[in-house]
């Protein structure tokens, strides 16, 4: 059985680049301080991060009763458009949900405001919630499926984001005040 380890993000990103056009199995050998990945003529060795992996199950919300179903590509386009006027420091975008409608709003005293609207699957109580636009784009840009599923509770609780076509893809995003 594989021991619990923490592999540096830089190593994972490098491995992805090296294996981008490859297929087949990748073997991993783990020592107390290092990991080695090998595939055909590729070998990558990295130090492991010293420490205990956090209990991530504690941060995955389980009582989010509001469900938003949205076309992932259209969502990315809307966030990208309205965030063009956000300030670089906060990058806050407000999402307003009501009756199968999602309104995106960004207000910036220096560059004005922007609003966009999208038809979505949402039938729960109205909700206004804010997120960092960069984080929304990073997460929804990773989804392989056509639909993104957001499971929400309220404007101050973590949101669960899922890829409708990949049951293993699970993202937790903390909201921000807007």
Language-model features, listed with the residues they occupy:
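DNA polymerase processivity clamps
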Residues: 1-49, 64-178
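Glycine-rich, pocket-lining loop/helix-strand segments that form or immediately flank
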Residues: 52
């Amino acid at each position: 059985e594989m021991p619990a380890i923490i592999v540096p993000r830089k190593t994972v990103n490098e491995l992805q680049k090296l294996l981008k056009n490859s297929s087949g199995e990748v073997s991993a050998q783990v020592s107390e301080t290092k990991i080695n990945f090998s595939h055909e003529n590729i070998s990558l060795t990295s130090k492991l991060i010293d420490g205990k992996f956090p209990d991530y199950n504690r941060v995955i919300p389980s009582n989010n009763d509001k469900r938003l179903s949205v076309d992932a590509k259209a969502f990315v386009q809307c966030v990208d458009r309205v965030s063009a006027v956000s300030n670089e420091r906060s990058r806050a975008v407000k999402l307003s949900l009501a009756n199968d409608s999602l309104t995106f709003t960004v207000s910036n005293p220096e560059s004005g405001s922007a609003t966009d609207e999208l038809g979505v699957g949402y039938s729960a109580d109205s909700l206004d919630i804010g997120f960092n636009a960069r984080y929304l784009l990073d997460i929804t840009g990773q989804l392989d499926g056509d639909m993104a599923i957001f499971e929400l509770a309220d404007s101050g609780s973590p949101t669960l984001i899922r890829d409708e076509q990949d049951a293993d893809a699970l993202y937790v995003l903390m909201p921000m005040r807007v």
